[in-house]
Amino acid sequence: MYRNRIKRLLDILLSACGILCLSWLLLLLAVAIKLDSPGPVFFRQKRVGIGKRHFQILKFRTMRIDTPHDMPTHLLHDPEQYITRMGRFLRKTSLDELPQLWNILVGDMAVIGPRPALWNQYDLLAERDKYGANDVRPGLTGWAQIHGRDELEIAEKAKLDGWYVEHISFGLDVKCFF
């Protein structure tokens, strides 16, 4: 019951409340991004959602517009050269993730779940298939993120995502959230 209906209802409530309560901050950050560097306020990127369905993830733009597009930041040669001043602040505080509240509201994502893989991260997607981790909505944060984020090897990240999927519960989501 929790996994299907209650979790989705909580996602809708939390994301709607988040958008409403933080609208002033979202607007302030959007203006700051525009003043800091040329280009759009938002960064959109093709990601993989539930059942390997593609969707466009929404984030505040933290990098220059000439940055290679479909590559994780940690794989770029000298990624610091691409990050804007405002981007450094947004990444350090994780405020660049706030626009994903929209992705949660419309059902592309959940508040808690495996982080959505890039469409071209075939190795991660294949590894997650072993554990059923592609069969749930991806999350803003998740079990693997609180255990190491990008520092984890793909096999370990997929295993942690699979453990989460196997043990989804309100209590586990609360533990991941806080």
Predicted regions and their residues:
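A hydrophobic, helix-centered structural microdomain
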Residues: 1-66, 103, 170, 175-178
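Cytosolic-biased juxtamembrane loops and peripheral soluble domains of multi-pass membrane proteins
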Residues: 3, 67-85, 89, 115-122
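Generic alpha-helical structural signal
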Residues: 7, 84-87, 159, 175
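Surface-exposed charged/polar residues within alpha-helices that form helix-capping/stabilizing sites
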Residues: 18, 88-91
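Hydrophobic structural segments characteristic of membrane proteins
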Residues: 40, 99-178
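Short, glycine-rich, amphipathic interfacial segments at transmembrane boundaries or analogous
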Residues: 43-82, 140-160
